[in-house]
Amino acid sequence: MSRPNDRITLPPANAQRTNMTCHFCIVGCGYHVYKWPELQEGGRAPEQNALGLDFRKQLPPLAVTLTPAMTNVVTEHNGRRYNIMVVPDKACVVNSGLSSTRGGKMASYMYTPTGDGKQRLKAPRLYAADQWVDTTWDHAMALYAGLIKKTLDKDGPQGVFFSCFDHGGAGGGFENTWGTGKLMFSAIQTPMVRIHNRPAYNSECHATREMGIGELNNAYEDAQLADVIWSIGNNPYESQTNYFLNHWLPNLQGATTSKKKERFPNENFPQARIIFVDPRETPSVAIARHVAGNDRVLHLAIEPGTDTALFNGLFTYVVEQGWIDKPFIEAHTKGFDDAVKTNRLSLDECSNITGVPVDMLKRAAEWSYKPKASGQAPRTMHAYEKGIIWGNDNYVIQSALLDLVIATHNVGRRGTGCVRMGGHQEGYTRPPYPGDKKIYIDQELIKGKGRIMTWWGCNNFQTSNNAQALREAILQRSAIVKQAMQKARGATTEEMVDVIYEATQNGGLFVTSINLYPTKLAEAAHLMLPAAHPGEMNLTSMNGERRIRLSEKFMDPPGTAMADCLIAARIANALRDMYQKDGKAEMAAQFEGFDWKTEEDAFNDGFRRAGQPGAPAIDSQGGSTGHLVTYDRLRKSGNNGVQLPVVSWDESKGLVGTEMLYTEGKFDTDDGKAHFKPAPWNGLPATVQQQKDKYRFWLNNGRNNEVWQTAYHDQYNSLMQERYPMAYIEMNPDDCKQLDVTGGDIVEVYNDFGSTFAMVYPVAEIKRGQTFMLFGYVNGIQGDVTTDWTDRNIIPYYKGTWGDIRKVGSMEEFKRTVSFKSRRFA
């Protein structure tokens, strides 16, 4: 999205060029950043511009993806101004030069005093008296570290709470997960930590990992090699755009048939097929039908929350048909018979529960698991995301799905895989979590626990389950501290620490937000610390096929903002100095080891030390071969990087990685076998069932293509705000008529857990009694009506809530300016 502009300044041939992985979704498209002095520009002849393209004539289609939104003018700390251009890299195997609406705006979101990023935090900001004031890092650290120290001394680590990112991409990455993790887990040693998108410190894939199969186990190329692709609880066009466009669609179009024949010469290859499992007909379904036709696309529009029954029915059927890999099961797995017995569900029972006709279930099974004419089992890839991750008992759904996948040997063979599609990129390197159980942090806060709460690179006021209850509790507790601080006129920093601590003894909570912007958390915060994002810092992350790349720094961050890992180091060093001053050598020693000057120092301290002699325990997605990865080697690898785990490095080949896991039949369990896991169908959780019985509408929710996460950038983009002035809710037109609402009307959405407001968006493809609301938006928070239910691992059922809807009124401006045409673009 960009404003009309009749020309773009081209980079001169000598412009600086660096590598950038897209900040946003897990696909991690490769981009090049060009930077050159503001008053210079390149010519239209290919030798006169850094793109090497001939702009003197019409370029061929897709010769380059280039829009005004991919350009900006930035100012360095020394006052010098530079043009920047952030364009997709055609040589990157991930995106092959394709851009997305999210990545295509990266340049626009780099900080400029008058641009979309003008609201960025530029200095630590303190809530003083009744207003926000910018302050110094030294002052901020004296207050923040001083309060942590007092809490540790008086209450121990249990008084210090965090909600923190655990991902890659912007606001994450291996450097930053290590810096924050080392501070929280090794230095402060608090177990009172939750992750950005779930209310405890846990995994989203406990079951699959226990079964021996990590969730990112294939390569994007495997989607090109598959006979059948399953998309389960996932909308890949909108959520993983260029994985879908650059790897899935070419297979559906027949463009990868020659590659399949070359790889597997003894197999026949019918035209590729795709199966969607989703109660909602998404834009991805519409596009797939347009590309492949109805005869190669199945949409299993299951009843909400019935995924486990679906997979159990299919598992039972393929076992009965003999469409399983018996030698593989015998040699490389454990627990098959128990799973067959526990998961047994006939197709008739499966159909009654899921609402999917028996003939459609049989067709899905035949496409995916019945041997091909050449005798081999189909190569079937199962890709899943939030419909399972945030589904009806994540643990059991994953178990049921993987039982089916293991039995049919659709993991460890090229063209297969049972994989998460993912949200953010990945980038996890941390010390082991210091707790012995999973703690529901939101509920602890609601109950009045904790003295200091830091939200780091996340915003649970917009994203948590049962969000309204969380906000109400935090705002009430925060107000107690604000009132105490307002009365402490003339207090020194040390005295203010005492004032704040006393207020927390009276039920208060000191709130800190570390982020790019003053998010909705500013309503509760007392201190905000300014962070940096890729391009303003060096950052490594890995994408959904475990491909690690280096996003290189090319500009200064705004003001005194800095990388999260360096913020963590600053906090740790402040605490070390305080304990040394007190003569507490043992406590001071906990905060040693943060003498980092650059992001590379943090990368070397964490990612590269994992599994090495003399290093402490480090949980890292780079594993024990991460030491082979250096910034210099990643620079040489460009936007293609290397797929983790790294196998080797030498001067001629560079970094050599791993395309697919489990190809030799050895899995991540103690005995090296894949473990089947019994997964009975148990219906809906009681809390959720109560809402369904009481209220009319299923309140489904998720992302769309244009808005990234909480709209932390997008809320400042005028075009985005014109398109989505508030969160929309897709509704069936007949339901709209019954409620007397049309596109642009405002409705209240409510149930026993809260209420929120949304803009009506009529959609013919939405079933009656079902809705879909934009998740995590800044204006209209869907999480207010999700329940407080979680599974055994404290994983919420974000998708599982029901409520009623009532008309509030009409917004004539919305009706006049917002398009309510179908988003099923095909």
From Swiss-Prot:
Involved in charge transfer (site feature) positions: 100
EC numbers for this chain: 1.20.9.1
One GO location term (cellular component): membrane
Cofactor (UniProt): [3Fe-4S] cluster; Mo-bis(molybdopterin guanine dinucleotide)
Coiled-coil regions listed: none
Binding note for cofactor: Binds 1 [3Fe-4S] cluster per subunit.
Iron-sulfur listed as a keyword: yes
InterPro entries: AioA/IdrA_3Fe-4S, AioA/IdrA_lsu, Asp_de-COase-like_dom_sf, MoPterin_dinucl-bd_dom, Mopterin_OxRdtase, Prok_molybdopt-oxidoreductase
Keyword Iron-sulfur: yes
GO BP terms: respiratory electron transport chain
Residues noted as binding [3Fe-4S] cluster in the record, renumbered to the chain: 22, 25, 29
Residues given in the record as substrate binding sites: 196, 204, 420, 424
Single GO MF descriptor: molybdopterin cofactor binding
Keyword set, alphabetical order: 3Fe-4S, Iron, Iron-sulfur, Metal-binding, Molybdenum, Oxidoreductase
One Pfam short name: Molybdopterin
Annotated catalysed reactions: 2 oxidized [azurin] + arsenite + H2O = 2 reduced [azurin] + arsenate + 3 H(+)
Protein's job: Involved in the detoxification of arsenic. Oxidizes As(III)O3(3-) (arsenite) to the somewhat less toxic As(V)O4(3-) (arsenate).
Similarity comment: Belongs to the prokaryotic molybdopterin-containing oxidoreductase family.
Designated name of the protein: Arsenite oxidase subunit AioA
Organism: Alcaligenes faecalis
